[in-house]
Amino acid sequence: MKYKVIVYYDSMEDSERVFSNENDAINELHRLRLKYRNARKYKVEMVEVDD
C-alpha cells in the first residue's frame, strides 16, 4: 500500500508526494497543513493507493 499526499490550489492539483510508509505520509500531511493553514485556496489531503 502506498500513500499520496496531495496539495490542491484553488481546487486544482498543485503537487503530489508518494510515500510507502503511512507514518511518513501522516507527518508530511501535518507539516503541509501547518504551512497552508492560513491560505484559504490551499487544501491538503492524503489518499491510499494500491501498488
Pin down the residues of each PLM region:
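Short aromatic-glycine-(Arg/Gly/Cys) micro-motifs in beta-strand/loop hairpins
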Residues: 1-15, 41-44
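Short, well-ordered helical secondary-structure segments
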Residues: 6-7, 29-31
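Short, mixed-charge low-complexity intrinsically disordered segments
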Residues: 14, 30-51
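Short amphipathic alpha-helices within nucleic acid-binding modules
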Residues: 23-29
